[in-house]
Amino acid sequence: MPSRIVFSGKQQVHHEPMTLPAPAAGEVLSRALYTLMSIGTENIVFNRLFEDGSHFDNWVKYPFYPGYSSVAEVVAVGEGVTDFKPGDHVAHRGKHASHHLTQAMHLVPVPAGMAPQKAAWWALAKIAFVGARAAEYLLGDTVLVIGAGPIGQMSLRWAVAAGAAHVVVVDPMANRLEFAKRGGATRTFSCPLNELKEPLMAELGGELPRVVIDSTGHNAVFAEALGLARPRGRLVLIGDTGTPTQQHLTSAVITQGLTIIGAHDCHNDNGWNDVKVGKYFCRMVQSGRFNMDDMITHTFAPADCAKAYATVNAARGTAMGVVFDWSKSE
C-alpha cells in the first residue's frame, strides 16, 4: 500500500499509509526508489529551529510532509503523456513517500545507467546551481565555500565545474571535508572562521577570494563571512536560516564595497528551471565532471523514519547523503 512520512508536530515523525488516484491527463504515477533527506532544512523543520514570523514559520503547518528530492520509476501515465513510459526512471520534487502523482512537465528523465542514489541529489544540486548563477563565476576564479554540508558540497562542485582555479572549503567538522576533497576542493580548513583570514590569504597568494558562498544556514556565519571577501567581492547566501533577525551587517559591506546576493531555490531565471537544471546535473554527473561517488552515508527504511531523524540530529558530522529506500515498497 502507498505510504509516506509525516511530521505531526515538533520532533514527531511517523510513517503512514496513503491513497492515490489513477493519473489524470498529463500526469505520471511513479513509485519512489529513493528520496534524499535535505538534512539542513529538514533538521530546522523537524526541531522547529525558526522564529515566529519567519518564512519557515509561514511554511511549516501540521501535518507537514517533508522531502523534495526523489528518484522514482514510472508506473503509469495519464492521457496525452508521450515523453515517459512505465519503467522509466525519473527525478522530481517528491516528498518522502512511496508513490507520487506528478505533472509530466515537471519530471527530469534520469539517463539509463545512472545510479538512482546519485540522481536523488538532483534537487539539492539545483539549489546550489542557483547560487552558482548568482556568483557569476569567472574562469580562474577564487572561491570560498563556508560549510561542507550537502548544499556546500553541491556548491563547491559547481564552482569547480565553472572553472574556478581555487575552491577553498571551510567546515569545523573534518569528516565533511573528505567529501569536499573528492568533489574538487583545492584546499580545506577546519578552523573557526575568525581564525581563517590569515591562512586563507596565504593559500590565495595574499588575497581574499572574489566569491564567498555561505551555505550554512547559521545566522552567526553571515557577519564573519563578510570579512572574508576581497574588496568589491561577492557574498552569496544560499544557506537558509530560521532566524534571519539574528543576521547582522558589518562595516565591511561599505568599506570593502561588497555585493551581497540572496540565492533561493525559487529563483528560476532565463529558462533555468528545475527540469533544465536537473537534466544538466545528470549530464555532468554521467560525464565525470561532477563527482557524486560515495556520497550516501546512511540508508533507512521508511518505517525507521524516527531513527533516521534522530540519527541525523546526533551525527551531524558524519551524516551527508541520507536516503529513504522505497524500492521494496508495494
Feature map (PLM): residue ranges:
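N-terminal glycine-rich cofactor-binding segment
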Residues: 7-22, 39-71, 91-93
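A glycine-/small-residue-rich N-terminal strand-loop-strand element
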Residues: 69-93
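Mid-domain Rossmann-like dinucleotide-binding core that forms the NAD(H)/NADP(H) cofactor-binding site
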Residues: 115-193
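Glycine-rich cofactor phosphate-binding loops and adjacent beta1-alpha1 units
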Residues: 178, 183-261
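C-terminal substrate-binding/catalytic core of Rossmann-like NAD(P)-dependent dehydrogenases/reductases
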Residues: 198-202, 206, 247-296, 307
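C-terminal hydrophobic helical "lid"/dimerization subdomain
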Residues: 223, 231, 277-330
